[in-house]
Amino acid sequence: MNFIYKSFCRTFQFCFRIAMPFLPYRKPTIFTNVKECVPLFQKLNIKSVLLVTDQGIRSAGITKPLEEYLEGNQIKCVVYDSTRANPTVQNVEESKSLYIKNNCQGLIAFGGGSSMDCAKATGALIAYPKKNLAKLKGLLKVWKKLPPLVAIPTTAGTGSEVTVTAVITDSEKKHKYTMNNFTMIPYYAVLDPQVTYSLPPSLTATTGMDALTHAVEAYIGQSTTKETRKLALQATKLIFKNILVAYQDGTNQQARANMLKAAYKAGIAFSKSYVGYIHAVAHSLGGQYNIPHGLANSVLMPIVLEKYGKSVYKKLSELAVAAELCTEETSIEEAAKIFIEEIKKMNIPEKLQGIKEEDIKVMAQHADKEANPLYPVPKLMNAKELEQLYKLVAQDF
């Protein structure tokens, strides 16, 4: 990356950092049991809601108690359960049509990040009935108030219940794009560990590492604040203390609750301090090959951190100490390397299958466009430099 563009990126990031405290960020009201949705909707005088989820969650019966509880209290519950792992424009359009057809007055996002992103984007289309998603993508495009939205995460990973972002895939163009504005934050979030009990160990690992990615990228970037640093450190400690327990015993209520808390804290941290190239590259891989976001982040994280090199050693060492992986007496470089090695021990694949060399250039361009100049990464890279990350993560070459 040439000096002029580097200077532009850093200036853009500095201006955004200065402006951030004056922007209307808000935290959702938190509940700890899904049944608390009923008195909430009664208070809001909502008679009909659209519940956005996926077929796996619904077929497992996880949404059934809430559906029955809502209907038993004269609140109509319409279900959209076709959300894909990387929600598509078509998913959002279908969800919107169902909302309008049934005269719904509010939204419930019940699932992982995909269901929450689909519900957020649905709310944006309801707020802007004459626009399509392409007109609403990018930064600060969605200003109108969305319908009341309750986010119920069934994974402890994305933190989408507290973030300003929805990520949607254009299947035709094989491209993922983000919608970013403060109006996209759900009004309410239910952090109920019981709805995460059935999450299989493999997804517990990858979604938990997704949350760790949020904490790490928020912490190592150049737009941190005292609050986001504190939240990122807390989230990192919670994840390292609880992810193995949750992996081995999915019904351990305390471990599941702590993982939800970690994802929430990391979500706030990266909403205010942003992410980096791990996410940008992961989004492009998800758009091109439909690779689950948590898996892509998990595999990419140690590779990108090693690519950053010495520029992140100090901050990684601080994260390592916070996670009690080493002590303050450990040298900065050694502590940073210990942190990266601990990530590699999380039973995550080292490589991703199916990446084609002929796709790398276009994916790198997408990642470059997403990340630069917005993401305050510790070390700037252009599209050509980002291509190396795809080659490092690819199984087949």
Region annotations inferred by a language model:
Residues Q90-P193:
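Glycine/threonine-rich beta-strand-loop-alpha-helix active-site module
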Residues N33-V34, T53-Q55, T83, F110-G112, ...:
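Fold-independent oxyanion-binding glycine-rich loops
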Residues S273-S331, I340:
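C-terminal catalytic subdomain
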Residues T165-S273, K384:
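Carboxylate- and glycine-rich phosphate/diphosphate-binding segment that chelates Mg2+/Mn2+
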Residues R58-K130, V245-R256:
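N-terminal small/polar loop signature for handling phosphorylated ligands or for N-terminal nucleophile
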Residues N2-C9, A323-F397:
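C-terminal charged capping/lid subdomain of soluble metabolic enzymes
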Residues M1-V79, Q388, D396-F397:
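An N-terminal, well-structured beta->alpha segment
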